[in-house]
């Protein structure tokens, strides 16, 4: 499985733990909803800045966001 797919699954899991929609996460992280959708499907390779914004929105560390992803 690619890193992008693993990351997308992780973001989807963490988002669902908060019972947030993709739109909720997009608003909290100030990221386009379509971009969140692409990320969760493994179709994007996000920058560190985007990952940081997602982590802050989810109230977790970047390390927690990347936990369990093979290449990290």
How would you name each of these model-derived features?
Residues 9-28:
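Short basic helix-loop element that most often maps to the first helix and adjoining turn
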Residues 31-44:
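Recognition helix of helix-turn-helix/homeodomain-like DNA-binding domains
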Residues 41, 60, 71:
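Short, conserved catalytic or interaction motifs in soluble domains
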Residues 1-6:
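A detector for short, charged/polar N-terminal pre-domain segments
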Residues 64-72:
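Short, charged recognition helix plus adjacent turn
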Residues 11, 25-26, 36-39, 65:
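Conserved hydrophobic/aromatic packing and binding residues within compact polymer-binding modules
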Residues 49-64:
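DNA major-groove recognition helix of helix-turn-helix/homeodomain DNA-binding modules
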